[in-house]
Amino acid sequence: MNLFPSDDRDDNYYPSSGRFFDVWLGRNDSRWGSDAEYNRATLNYSQYLPVSSNHIIALSLNASEVDGDTPFFLKPSLNMRGFVTTKYQDEAAASTHIEWRYKFSTRWGSMVSYEAGSVGSSLSKLKNIILSVGAGIRWKIQKDNNLNLGVDVGVSKDDSAFYIVIGEKF
């Protein structure tokens, strides 16, 4: 069940102003045909701050928690750059992200990110904070559409990763 959805972003592909807020609650149960019984709660919040016509600060906060017999592939994990997504996975995960997006021409841009997150047995018992930094280049696929194709690199204390992306992370 999607509670309190709110979206006043100026664009779905490359937002430069506005907010996105979403709270989702779900229950899987054998009464509804599920093989596993568990609850899941997820919160996503993003805000986009235009510093100028070419500079955007994008902020995001994500939190998720499950309880019950949750399949491993549906457990919360840190959706951050710099390591394999399932490297940090538990019953709860929370992360915050900040990106500086810069358009240096009509079809070319760049991105620099800083992310922090943690996982644990519940949101009140999160463990060590994981940090990552990233950078990327963007190319606007069509002149009339704000959809970007990009290449990102992310680095954390444990690992690094290379990404080919369509659109923005958030």
Residues covered by each model-derived region:
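Exposed loop/turn and edge beta-strand positions of beta-sandwich/beta-sheet ligand-binding modules
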Residues: N39, A92-A94, L131-V133, L147, ...
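Low-complexity, intrinsically disordered Gly/Pro/Thr-rich segments
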Residues: N145-V153
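Outer-membrane beta-barrel "beta-signal"
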Residues: F4, A135-D144, D159-F170
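A short alpha/beta connector and helix-capping loop motif
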Residues: K125-I137
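Short active-site-adjacent structural elements
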Residues: G120-L123, N146, K157-F162
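Hydrophobic, well-ordered secondary-structure elements that form the walls
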Residues: I98, E115, I137, V151, ...
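C-terminal outer-membrane beta-barrel translocator/porin domains of Gram-negative envelope proteins
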Residues: M1-T106, S110-A116, G120-S121
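Conserved short loop/turn motifs at secondary-structure junctions
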Residues: D29, V153-G154
